[in-house]
Amino acid sequence: MEVEIRQEDEFIKLGQALKKAGLVDSGVDAKMIIQDGRVTVNGEIEERRGRKLYPGDVVSLEGDSFKVVK
């Protein structure tokens, strides 16, 4: 599944983006999945829930991915 998420601000944090894309149900779920090293941003494992995502960034979680767009 590939999804685009739109954000109005300059950036969106990784945990928020995962929730907005529907890949996790809560912030707690996002935190656990990110800390487990199961999320990649632009092809690299990311373990910071507060990582700022900008338009063009691609996030993947176990075969699902989304792209941040303005």
Residues covered by each model-derived region:
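A basic, amphipathic helix-loop patch mediating RNA/tRNA/ribosome contacts
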Residues: 13-52
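Short, charged beta-turn/beta-strand-edge "cap" motif at the junction between a beta-strand
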Residues: 63-68
